[in-house]
Amino acid sequence: MATNRRDFLKKTALATAGGLVLPTLTYSNMKGVFPKQGLKLSFEPYDLQLKHVFTLANSSRTTTPVMLTKLEIDGFTGYGEASMPPYLGESQETAANFLSALNLGQFSDPFRMEEILEYIDEAAPGNTAAKASVDIALHDLAGKIMNQPWYKIWGYSPENTPHTSFTIGIDEPEVVKQKVEEAAPYKILKVKLGSDNDKEMIETIRSVTDKPLCVDVNQGWKDKKVALEMVEWLKEKGIEFVEQPLPKENRDDIAWLSENAPLPIIADEAIQRLCDVKKAAGIYSGINIKLMKCTGMREAHQMINLAHANQMRVMIGCMTETSCAISAAAQLSPQAEWADLDGNLLISNDPYEGVKVADGKITLIDQPGIGIREI
C-alpha cells in the first residue's frame, strides 16, 4: 500500500529525538512474509593505503587496517566498515573474533534495529569499531529495503550539510606545502599539532594560504599555561577552534583552559560514547563524534541531539576510512556545525563510491541506505 513520507515517518517514529525505534513497520508487513532465514553477516579484512605518511602527535603510519562487512537478507545487501587505527585498540584479529561470535541469524526482521544493536553492544565490552561496522551495514540494509537514504528518513535537508575540512598531518615544510596544494578544493583545513614544531607547521601553511584553519592537538600539549599561550598565538594566525589540546584525563586543566582561551575548545579523545556527552558539558564548547568510537550511526544520532540539548556544538568526524563509513557519517552531517569527513580522500585504494564533495561542501546523493556502491 502506498504511503507518503510524512505518514511513513509518523508511523515508524524515525523523526523523534530518540531516533530508531520502528514500532509498527516491520520487514514482514513490508514484504508480506518473513524470509525463511535470518540476517547473514560476512566480513573480510582490507588494508587502506595512505597517499602520504600520516603523522599525529604520538604516531605515524602509511596504512590503516579495516574490516569490511556485509549484511544480507532476501536479496538485499548492506555494507559496513570498521576502521582500526592503532590508537583505537582494535585490530583485524579482534574484529574477526568479535564478529564471528555474533549470531545475527536469529534476527529475521532487520527493522528490529534497537533489539539487534543492543544485542551487538552487549555481546562484549569495547570493540566499538567492529560494532560500528554492523550498525552501518544494518542501516544501509534497512535504507535499501525502504528505498530511502538515511538523511531523508531522519528528515534532514541535504542543503544543510557543512563544508568538510581537509586534514594536514604533521610533516616536513615542503610536504606540508604539497598537501595544502592538494587541498585546493577545500575551504577549511584541519592541521594536526602536538609536536615541537607546531608554530613552524602553522607558519608554513600560512605562507601559502589564508584559508580558515582549525587544529587538532590529539592531547599533545601537557601544560595548561603553555596551552593557553599557544591558543592565544593561534588566534592571531586565524585559527577557528582547537581540538583536544590537553590529555582528556586533565578535566580541571581543560576547564581552566576553556574558561580563559580566546578560541573554542572541542573534545575529541574525551568523547567516545553517549555517556561521555554530559561529562563534556560545561568543560568543552563542542564535541567531535566519530562512528568508530561510538558504535555507529544509531548512537551518533543520539549524541548529536544530547550535545545540542546541552548547548554544545557538534563536529562529525572520522578515522582514515573508505567511502562506506564516510558516507554513513555524512547522513548525519546536516545536523552538525562542522564536518571532518575526509578520511576517504587520504587513501589511494577506496573500494566504494559514495558521498561527494563539491567545492569543499559535502553533497549527499539521493541513493538508498548510506548511498554507496562497490567499485
Predicted regions and their residues:
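N-terminal secretory signal peptides
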Residues: M1-N4
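Catalytic alpha/beta core domains of metabolic enzymes, predominantly
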Residues: N260, I266, A270-L341
